[in-house]
């Protein structure tokens, strides 16, 4: 995607938030995507909820709300958007869907996992309950 004058002008306020962690030389690579994603969010009535560990481009560039998983669930339950994009891991998107069964919940990276949540299985929990 091309880094045009229009995109530079539209994304300049966003770059000011990212400038301390993203070198200026890299901004022309990211800005067109950030600009396009932000336009699509408005067109599609979508909201992007991002976990704290996301990259600066996502955290500052496209997310509407960034926080820990609990705060993301609370925000997901309050949003009026018809589409929730969860920039996080599987269980975060699953919980957002449970709280919003009538809304579309998207997980951009299907390989996004959490070592803590995959450490124990349902079978493990059932065995622990028997003890």
Question: PLM features: what roles do these ranges have?
Answer:
Residues 2-131:
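Active-site loop-to-helix "anion-binding N-cap" substructures in soluble metabolic enzymes
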